[in-house]
Amino acid sequence: QRQMCIRDRGNYTRTVVNSYTNSYANSLTKRYTAEVRNYKLDFGAQYTTRLSKKDELTVGVTYSLGHDIGGNPMLEIVSTNSQTGVADTTSYPLAGQKNMKLAIPHSIGAGFMYNHNNKLKIGFDYNLQKWASVSFPVYKADATPEQSYVMNDNAFKDRHKFTLGTEICPEEDSRSFIKRIKYRAGVSYVTPYLNVDGGDGPKELSASFGFGIPIMNSYNSRSILNISAQWVNLKCNRFVTENTFRINIGLTFNERWFAKWKVE
């Protein structure tokens, strides 16, 4: 079995090919397509209150609107005779069936961050994506022709994500280079939103550690080189456990890098 997936500016094409060494067996090709042109709306609010002279607390909430995005998903099944090369094609939805629509879920998030004198920051985020209310087209080979490619209400389940992180900076305005380095660490846990053969998909557990190195010169004192290492564990009881180790490097620019110079 071979699979190929192509995404291009809202166009989605996924091809699955089943071929056999037996020359008397027909090869089977399934081609899933969809075309999406739509919008996504995100809203958020944030409030910061000072707890004391050196301590402050920031809380925030986010909301993403879930709605139908169309797409008109279609399936084309091609059965090819390996000896003669003659192909038989069946396209879904069948004539007389309604066009199907894809959708994105409602998403709700909330979090807080505690800041002690810009030396210690601790934050926690929670995000809920309501995938259980989203339907998805599924092909069933053992169903009647009219029920072979239809919207499935049990394809997904709600996704929960929990994130905890901290940042320590000994002295942000110190003349010492070492004391200006920001040390960061975090963990996250994500529940699966996929239902695989009636069971849960893989759960994700990750941990990361890194630091931000200040870049200092005559005209720039706020740009930071960010380096971090991340371990990600994907685990599902019925499938292979996957462990991934990543190294991330990024650069936060000072806005003065983009200022236009003027000569008077």
Predicted regions and their residues:
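Extracellular loop and loop/strand-boundary signature of outer-membrane beta-barrel proteins
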Residues: A25-T33, L94-N99, P145-A155, Y193-G199, ...
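Residues on the lipid-exposed face of transmembrane beta-strands in outer-membrane beta-barrel proteins
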Residues: G10, F43-Y47, A110-Y114, F124, ...
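Residues that define the transmembrane beta-barrel architecture of outer-membrane proteins
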Residues: R37-L41, I104-I108, F156-F162, G201-A207, ...
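Short loop/turn motifs that connect adjacent beta-strands in outer-membrane beta-barrel proteins
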Residues: R50-L57, K119, E171-I181, M216-S223, ...
